[in-house]
Amino acid sequence: MKKTAFTLLLFIALTLTTSPLVNGSEKSEEINEKDLRKKSELQGTALGNLKQIYYYNEKAKTENKESHDQFLQHTILFKGFFTDHSWYNDLLVDFDSKDIVDKYKGKKVDLYGAYYGYQCAGGTPNKTACMYGGVTLHDNNRLTEEKKVPINLWLDGKQNTVPLETVKTNKKNVTVQELDLQARRYLQEKYNLYNSDVFDGKVQRGLIVFHTSTEPSVNYDLFGAQGQYSNTLLRIYRDNKTINSENMHIDIYLYTS
């Protein structure tokens, strides 16, 4: 009897350390799998830069920043953002509208995003890095405890387990970018997402979907990037899309053909 009880408790403990199946489905309603872009349609430069962005490059992460400075009306310039970077001092954040800027300019904000220097236009030349979105309000946006986001992942229709620690946030309202950066890093590490076929990059198409209980879902074609360099590859985050982290989960669909 004691052995049976111990076995049951061990099973429960192991289950809680991985992402459960949460309101998932084997196919996304947002984008048909046949419409997903194939990895072979990306140029080699773009594929290499996607790998660099999501796996190797450090991210801009900070809390409780404030700035009234701008370069253009759809930007906010954070002077002295980098304190120990080899090249950059300032961070120029670009949004797709002035309305978004007005929500954050002069307010206490938190930042989490992928930044780049090559082809960054604005600020002090060679001393300013650029980033699209990645901004949330600081005040009254902190969870009482860190949120670990459950992930459902299917590879060619077969569900694979994803550790529950893979994607997490301490924010009530979080940018999709923050969650997406963490998820794609895992996909690169586990599945060589942005490797070429020669270097064991077996995944040929993919879709990531961010679901919440109260808002429309947000989805990205994992190989749907435009252009070759960070200034265009990262433009999907320019809308600074945020979602409520409560009762949310992520669905990922990967295909090897």
Curated annotation (Swiss-Prot):
Q: Which PROSITE patterns match?
A: STAPH_STREP_TOXIN_1, STAPH_STREP_TOXIN_2
Q: What does this protein do?
A: Staphylococcal enterotoxin that activates the host immune system by binding as unprocessed molecules to major histocompatibility (MHC) complex class II and T-cell receptor (TCR) molecules. In turn, waves of cellular activation, cytokine production, and migration into the lung tissue and airways occur via alphabeta T-cells. Also causes the intoxication staphylococcal food poisoning syndrome. The illness is characterized by high fever, hypotension, diarrhea, shock, and in some cases death.
Summarize where Zn(2+) binds, as residue positions: H211, H249, D251
**Gene Ontology molecular function: any one:** toxin activity
Q: What else is known?
A: This toxin seems to be coded by a bacteriophage.
Q: How does it assemble?
A: Monomer. Interacts with MHC class II molecules alpha/HLA-DRB1 and beta/HLA-DRA chains. The interaction with MHC-II molecules occurs at both zinc-dependent and zinc-independent sites. Interacts with T-cell receptor beta variable 7-9/TRBV7-9.
The question of whether Metal-binding is a record keyword is answered with: yes
Which range is the signal sequence, renumbered to this chain? 1-24
- Organism (species): Staphylococcus aureus
Give the cofactor binding note.
Answer: Binds 1 zinc ion per subunit. The zinc ion is necessary for the toxin interaction with MHC class II.
Q: Which family does it belong to?
A: Belongs to the staphylococcal/streptococcal toxin family.
SS bond partners: C120-C130
Instruction: Name its cellular compartments.
Output: Secreted
Q: What keywords sit in the KW lines? A: Disulfide bond, Enterotoxin, Metal-binding, Secreted, Signal, Superantigen, Toxin, Zinc
What cofactor requirement does the entry state?
Zn(2+)
Coarse class of the protein's main subcellular location? secreted
* Name of the protein described by the UniProt record: Enterotoxin type A
One GO cellular component term of this record is: extracellular region
- Tell me which domain of life the UniProt entry assigns to the organism this sequence originates from: Bacteria
